[in-house]
A protein has these predicted regions:
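Alpha-helical context
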Residues: 1, 5-12, 16, 68-72, ...
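Amphipathic, interaction-prone secondary-structure segments
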Residues: 47-110
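Glycine-rich, aromatic-bearing surface loops/beta-hairpins
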Residues: 107-157
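Charge-rich, low-complexity N-terminal segments
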Residues: 1-57
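Low-complexity, intrinsically disordered/propeptide-like segments
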Residues: 28, 99, 154-157
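Intrinsic-disorder-associated interaction segments
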Residues: 14-18, 22, 29, 81, ...
């Protein structure tokens, strides 16, 4: 199941079902995070995926009077483009890297975005980069880019 499939199931469900599905969705993203984390061969305490209010933050965007408006998942169903694909982002906010004492060293935003039914891993370090998830090599490339971002951040501190 892709993130996109999972998200489509979340809309218009009861809060109880929604919460359970959020957890499944978060697990899906944490899978990406763990692949990225395993690529790090630097001495860090832990890497964790932080989420908005303990759950992934799902939102749709739509255009209104020439400007883009962002709405959260509990306000209305996804907005569809003319070609039928939804304007949806799925964010797993930030990966926190801590030292052995649990002190935060750095945090690098890492999210998954759905665009034209393609899943993308988005990493914002010194540079912004998107990786279309079409096979495992894309995840490995994202992991390598993330690792480089981490090393650059650590060099600054």
């Amino acid at each position: 199941m892709t993130t996109y499939d999972a998200m489509c199931r979340i809309w218009n469900t009861s809060e109880e079902v929604k919460k359970k599905q959020y957890q499944q969705l978060l697990s899906l993203i944490k899978n990406y995070v763990s692949i990225i984390y395993n690529s790090l061969d630097i001495p860090v305490g832990k890497v964790e995926a932080a989420a908005h209010n303990e759950k992934p933050y799902v939102f749709a965007t739509y255009e209104e009077n020439g400007r883009f408006v962002r709405i959260s998942d509990n306000q209305r169903p996804p907005v569809l483009r003319k070609n039928g694909s939804p304007k949806i982002n799925f964010q797993v906010s930030i990966i926190l890297i801590t030292d052995e004492l649990g002190e935060n060293i750095i945090s690098i935003p890492c999210s998954v975005k759905i665009e034209n039914n393609h899943e993308k891993i988005v990493i914002r370090g010194d540079n912004y980069q998107e990786f279309v998830v079409d096979d495992d090599s894309a995840i490995e490339d994202a992991a390598e880019f993330f690792k480089t971002s981490v090393l650059l951040e650590l060099a600054k501190s």
